[in-house]
Amino acid sequence: AFRQALEDAIELRHSAVHPWSEAWTSGKLDRRQLAEWVKQHFHYVSHFAEWVAAVYANCPHPEVQHFLLENVTEEEGFVGMHGAAPVRHSDLLLEFAETCGMKREEILNAQVNGELLPETLGLQSWCAVQSHKPFVEALSGLLIGLESQVPKIYSKTTPPLLEKYGFSEEEV
């Protein structure tokens, strides 16, 4: 009942229906804008394994710890997901940004160069704090609240990269 209530609440404000996602799926963005999105998104994704590891460290349930450890190893590229070759998730973003015309260094140095949006910094801060909350709160916020949105978002935003933006399968 708790998880369903949480999922229902997420659905009301799901990232897949955010105006940015709508602009993306309708083909209204250019490659530079997509690269700027990567610049922001990278600085969330590149820390996600750390935050999940903190939840793992505070988890009292061995079966959930196993799930969390699998999540960390997938994020960090030690194991592949769904039969795919292992690759660090943040590296996928860097490769996509390069495909969009942005240099890796620009993304990697965005935080120290003061180029992250307040919203990105706020999300980083919230995730860091959330990861050290009691286990149920941390798990609910980070994995159910945030990460569970990813499949729906990417299933909506990936096809337009091929169909409207002219990316190849390899680039995507």
At which residue positions do the language-model features occur?
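Alpha-helical bundle segments that constitute or directly flank the non-heme di-iron/ferroxidase center
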Residues: 9-14, 24, 28-60, 78, ...
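Helix N-cap / loop-to-helix initiation motif
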Residues: 30, 60-61, 103, 168
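Short, solvent-exposed secondary-structure capping/transition elements
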Residues: 47-50, 64, 105-106
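His/Met- and acidic-residue-enriched segments that coordinate or traffic transition-metal cofactors
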Residues: 21-22, 94
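Active-site-proximal alpha-helical scaffolds that flank and shape metal-associated catalytic sites
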Residues: 2-3, 66-172
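Acidic, low-complexity proline/glycine-rich segments
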Residues: 1-21, 115-119
